[in-house]
Amino acid sequence: LLIGTRLVPQTSKYSDTGLNNYQSLGSNSDVQIAMTSRKYNPEKDFMVVQFNVKSDSGAAIDLQKIKFKLAMINVQPVKYTVIPLTNNQIVVTIRGIKSGYQAIQLKAINKAPNASALDQGDTTDVLNTNSSSSSSSSSDDETGSTNSVKFIINENKDFESTKLQLLNQKDYTIKALQKQINTLRKNRKHQQKLIAAYQAQIEADKQSIENNNADAKYKVSDSSSSTGNSNAQSDISTQRDNIKTSRKNIKKIDQQIELYQQQIRDVQSGKYKFQSGSTTSRLK
């Protein structure tokens, strides 16, 4: 009677980390990270967890400096791979994770230099047998690193999907690059529409000047015509500057699209080097 059935996942004592909840990756860093998605395929025994990283200052973020460690309540010989993508996104794939794992912890660690954490270790995990309950933290308690954030994922049917597909590093990277290219192309079209609007405004200003000059022939003295022409000329100058800015934006967009396309070609040819995968049987 039990064939083909699955037990209801046992709830752990640890609280789930919420989605899109950004937390600091360092006391002296403005880098923040959030888990944005987690899906599990119980038939094919794999999980896909997505993260997004951002900087309050807008500074560039080296995703290669962000490492992950995996811990489990019910330890299984799983393999996990960290895949940095474009647009500050990271995908972590966990293979060989079977139903009954109860809860896992993914700890993101910022390996970028941080003076306040140089002398601190990185020794504790939420899922240690004697640890207290916690959902996530921007520090590792009193003895750990202040450059890490812990994400707890409890076993839950709500985010299970047998339709979930596991892509390899190449596929995830190419998919993300193509998405970025599509976004850039939309932005390019927007810039072209702006240019058309700026040009239309210039033509309207020129027509206004022409009309003012024609009307001035029949007036003894009219300062309003002179003022109107001055305003129109000023607006023409502004619109021309706007056109230059949009054309510069288009040039940058075209350059970035070409770089992404080159990266896709390098990924397809094998020239692009990925991070090596990680294997774990037990993490404390």
Report residues per predicted region.
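N-terminal, leucine/charged-rich tether regions that mediate assembly and partner docking
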Residues: 1-95
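C-terminal amphipathic alpha-helix
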Residues: 242-284
